[in-house]
Every structure is written in C-alpha cells, then in structure tokens.
C-alpha cells in the first residue's frame, strides 16, 4: 500500500520516464521501487532510520551529495526540516533543476510557493487525495551553510550543560516540560550501563552523564539530525558516550542497568504508539537483572496498563498536571 502522496504521483508516471530520480523528505513507502521500470535510476535520501533500514538504496545522512534529473520531495509538517532539506538539495543542483513537491494539505504544503518563489518558478499541477503536487524549476541557486542551522540552548535546570540541536529534532530550541520532569528524578546514585532511547538532541543522556560521570551512556534515535545533535551535545560538554541509529531496539544488543526515555508519541500529525509499545514490550530483554525502565509520558496516554502487563506493576516517580514519570524493574 502506497501513501496518499504517492497515489497522486502515480497519476503522473510520464514525468519519471527515463530520468534519474532522487526521492527525499518524508517518504515512507516503496513507491521508488514501484517506478523503477519507468525511471533511468532511483535514489532515496532519508533522515528516518526506521524507513531507511527497511528499504534498499537509501542514503541515511544529515546532508545529501546526490544529484538527479528530477528531485521528488515529500513535504513534512516540520517547517524547519523542510526548509533545511530543500535548501540543501537545491544548493547542490544546477540552474534548470526540476523538483516535484508533494504533500498533504493539512501538513502545510501550500506554503511551498512562498518558500521557493525567490529561487525559481513554482506552481501547482495537481490536487487529489487531500494533497497538492507542485512543480518547481530552479533559476537561482541558494546558499547553504550547515553551521547556520545549529541552535544552542541553556536552562537553569541543566546547570552549565549546553544543548546543541539541528532542525527537525524534538524540542530543538528549549527544554520541554516532559523532559524537565524526567530530569528531576535523576540523582547522583545512578550507576552502570545506561541507554537513552529516542535521545533527540541528547539532553537526557548528557545530563545523566554529567551527574554520574562513572556511568557508561549509550544514546540512540531514528532521526539523522538527532544523532548528529546528540553527538555534538556530548562533545561540546566534554562528555563521553556512544550515539548511533536504532529503531527502538533494532540495533541494540547489550543489556543495561537503566533504560531512560522521553518517547515520541507523535508520528507526523497523528498520534502513534508503535515505538512506545515496542519499547515497553521489549525492554525486559535489554535490562540486566533488577534493571530499571524509566519513561516520561503525557498523563492521558494508556502506558500504565502496558507497563503492568509486561512488568507486573509500576511506580510513579514524579507527576504534574500534564506528565508522569513511570518506573518499572526487570
């Protein structure tokens, strides 16, 4: 089953005929494989490891150095992410580069005309499945400097810890309330091997490492920008730790004394529980005897039942009007 966006693109297969094509953005299906019979070649650039690991010929990286006759960009709801990716792609292109931009109307794809007007001609060529399809031709190559996209934030809660983040990373500009509540439960008595799963910019793992220098911290995420951000957060604060891509536990083999997380519950603009459900269901296999899983979540989410199902019972370490910090032990 292909996405609504790909269903619209399917109406325009003649545009792919005998061209080298680079797919980018929020693509999440196997449409590139399905059109290989029409195209000269297909490549995919994705920031999302959960997608990249299930598809062939996907480049999982912060920036792309690939070129193609036609770029097909899948719009996402994260405006900072879209702006970064399109500017980076166009900075590597030649004048005359053709781009198709497809996205759901509810994700704000209409704003593509304003975003790209300075750099060429853009116009809508189709509207269906609650999506808009736009054609763009490059006339002015944008300047792109990765360093200008870095954001740094501080917080009284974090002490002298500085957090570095790139576009598209959760809570990229400030410490969010859920993470702040989770950090309030971290003391100086944590030891051993620690996994910060879904690390984002690395604030949880870095804060924990700073409070407990003898711990061995591993941080993982599915988002390329999060991984790059977490690595820099560690380096800039002179902290040691391992950071790598993993779709929940897909690339994690070790067992830990503590698995800690502010897990995502938004997938695009829909609420999704897959990652959190997998985290809770599989955590016991990645905890040492007596090891702890500690997560923060919106109080309305049905995680207590799931925690009790797989661990027998749970404790609430902290709560406020919106969030709760849950703890279970293997």
Regions found by a protein language model. Name each.
Residues 59-61, 244-246, 297:
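Short loop/edge segments at beta-strand edges and connector loops
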Residues 81-156:
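N-terminal auxiliary segments of SAM/dcSAM-dependent transferases
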Residues 1-55, 175-261:
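Conserved SAM/SAH cofactor-binding pocket of Class I
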Residues 70-80, 197-202, 256-269:
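Conserved proline-anchored active-site loop of SAM-dependent methyltransferases
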Residues 93, 252, 286-287:
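A generic alpha-to-beta junction signature in SAM-dependent methyltransferases
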Residues 39-40, 94-97, 214-215, 291:
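A short helix->loop->beta-strand "cap" motif at the edges of active sites that frequently abuts
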Residues 100-120, 124-127, 270-329:
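Conserved Class I SAM-dependent methyltransferase catalytic core
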Residues 127-193:
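SAM-dependent Rossmann-like transferase core, predominantly class I methyltransferases
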């Amino acid at each position: 089953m292909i996405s609504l966006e790909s269903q619209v693109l399917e109406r325009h297969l003649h545009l792919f005929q005998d061209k080298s094509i680079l797919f980018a953005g929020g693509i999440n299906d196997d449409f590139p494989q399905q059109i290989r019979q029409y195209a000269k070649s297909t490549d995919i650039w994705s920031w999302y490891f959960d997608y990249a690991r299930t598809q062939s010929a996907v480049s999982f990286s912060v920036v792309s150095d690939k070129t193609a006759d036609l770029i097909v960009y899948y719009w996402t709801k994260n405006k900072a992410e879209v702006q970064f990716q399109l500017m980076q792609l166009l900075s590597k292109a030649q004048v005359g580069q053709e781009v198709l931009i497809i996205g759901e109307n509810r994700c704000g794809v209409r704003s593509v005309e304003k975003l790209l007007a300075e750099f060429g001609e853009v116009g809508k060529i189709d509207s269906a499945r609650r999506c808009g399809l736009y054609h763009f031709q490059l006339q002015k190559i944008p300047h792109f400097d990765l360093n200008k996209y870095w954001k740094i934030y501080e917080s009284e809660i974090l002490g002298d810890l500085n957090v570095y983040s790139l576009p598209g990373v959760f809570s990229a500009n400030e410490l969010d309330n859920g993470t702040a509540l989770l950090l309030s439960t971290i003391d100086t008595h944590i030891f051993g091997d620690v996994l910060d799963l879904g690390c984002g910019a690395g604030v949880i793992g870095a804060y924990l490492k700073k409070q407990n220098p003898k711990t061995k911290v591993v941080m993982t995420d599915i988002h390329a920008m999060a991984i790059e951000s977490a690595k820099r957060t560690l380096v800039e604060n002179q902290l040691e730790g391992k950071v790598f891509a993993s779709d929940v536990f897909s690339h994690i083999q070790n067992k830990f004394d503590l698995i800690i997380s502010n897990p995502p519950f938004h997938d695009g603009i829909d609420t999704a529980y897959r990652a959190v459900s997998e985290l809770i269901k599989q955590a016991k296999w990645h905890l040492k005897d007596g090891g702890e899983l500690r997560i923060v979540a919106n109080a309305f989410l049905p995680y207590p039942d799931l925690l009790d199902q797989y661990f027998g019972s749970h404790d609430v370490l902290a709560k406020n009007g919106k969030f709760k910090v849950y703890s279970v032990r293997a």
